[in-house]
A protein has these predicted regions:
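Bacterial N-terminal signal peptides
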Residues: 8-17
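Extracellular beta-sheet/turn segments enriched in Thr/Pro/Gly and aliphatic residues
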Residues: 23-27, 101-119
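Structural motif
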Residues: 35-46
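Hydrophobic beta-strand segments
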Residues: 44, 49-55, 85
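Short, acidic Ser/Thr/Gly-rich low-complexity loop/linker segments typical of extracellular
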Residues: 57-71
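A short, solvent-exposed beta-strand micro-motif common in secreted/extracellular proteins
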Residues: 70, 81-91
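Short, flexible loop/turn segments at beta-strand junctions in immunoglobulin-like
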Residues: 74-77
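Edge beta-strands of extracellular beta-sandwich domains
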Residues: 94-101
């Protein structure tokens, strides 16, 4: 009888563990990514440009320094929030781009052009 109780307990634990993993992967698949490139006026990748991403619901701001190819990436974003994205480098600034919660794409790709003077 003890053996059977242990077996039932083990099966219950395994079922619970599998359901938790499935829920986590489902939640992960619902998250969104914003990625892209920062370029200067001449369309050259702007290495070291700082990209700012602001969650308009929480006002939380995340930043990312563009790599040697001007690339940036923000992942794990809430699909139910709106965001503003812009880049800055050495006194230049890009236009602020909007990412809407109504846009159902899981991955948003942007080109941020540094063409304005920073305020």
């Amino acid at each position: 009888m003890k053996r059977r109780a242990w077996f039932v307990l083990l099966v219950a634990i395994l079922i619970f563990a599998v359901s938790v993993v499935a829920q986590d992967s489902k939640k992960e698949s619902q998250l969104r990514t914003v990625r892209g490139v920062v370029v200067d006026k001449g369309e050259t990748p702007a290495q070291g440009g700082v990209v700012f991403l602001k969650n308009l619901r929480t006002n939380q701001v995340r930043s990312y320094i563009a790599d040697s190819e001007g690339l940036f990436r923000f992942s794990g974003l809430d699909p139910n929030a709106d965001y503003e994205v812009h880049a800055e480098k050495e006194g230049a600034k890009s236009q602020t781009r909007q990412v809407s919660s109504f846009d159902n794409r899981k991955e948003i790709v942007l080109t941020l052009k540094l063409d304005k003077k920073k305020d």
